[in-house]
C-alpha cells in the first residue's frame, strides 16, 4: 500500500548561487558527508546537490510533514546502490515518522527517482508499506 507521495523541483542555477554564497556552512547544514563526497566528485556539482535537495523536499512531503515538526535536512539522505540506483536513507526524526506511519505487520520501503534537465532537477518519492514475510515454519 502507498503511505505517501512527494515531489519537488529545484533550480540548479539557484543551487549554484547558494553554494557560492554560503559554501561549506550551507553544505554542512543540509547534506551528509556521503552526499557531499558524491557531489564534489561529479562534473555537475550544483546539479548533484540540487537533485539531493529536491529528494529531501520530496521525502518530507511523502512523510506528510514538509520540513517542520522536528525534521532535519540531514535526517534524509540520498545514497546510491552499486547499480547507480538512488536510495533514501532515513535517520532521526524522519525515521521515527516513517515508523509511526507504517502499519503493524508491514515494513516501509522508500522509493526515490531523480532526474535533471538544466536548469531543473526533480525528485519523486513514494513510500510503500509491504507486508512482512511470515517466518518459515
Curated annotation (Swiss-Prot):
Needed co-factor(s): Mg(2+)
EC number per UniProt: 2.7.8.7
Gene Ontology annotations of biological process type: fatty acid biosynthetic process
Keywords: Cytoplasm, Fatty acid biosynthesis, Fatty acid metabolism, Lipid biosynthesis, Lipid metabolism, Magnesium, Metal-binding, Transferase
Organism domain of life: Bacteria
Annotated positions binding Mg(2+): 8, 57
One of the record's GO molecular function terms: magnesium ion binding
Protein's cellular compartments: Cytoplasm
Record's keyword annotation contains Glycoprotein: no
Known catalytic reactions: apo-[ACP] + CoA = holo-[ACP] + adenosine 3',5'-bisphosphate + H(+)
One Pfam assignment: ACPS
Annotated GO CC locations: cytoplasm
Family designation: Belongs to the P-Pant transferase superfamily. AcpS family.
Function: Transfers the 4'-phosphopantetheine moiety from coenzyme A to a Ser of acyl-carrier-protein.
Protein name in UniProt: Holo-[acyl-carrier-protein] synthase
Organism the protein comes from: Cereibacter sphaeroides (strain ATCC 17029 / ATH 2.4.9)
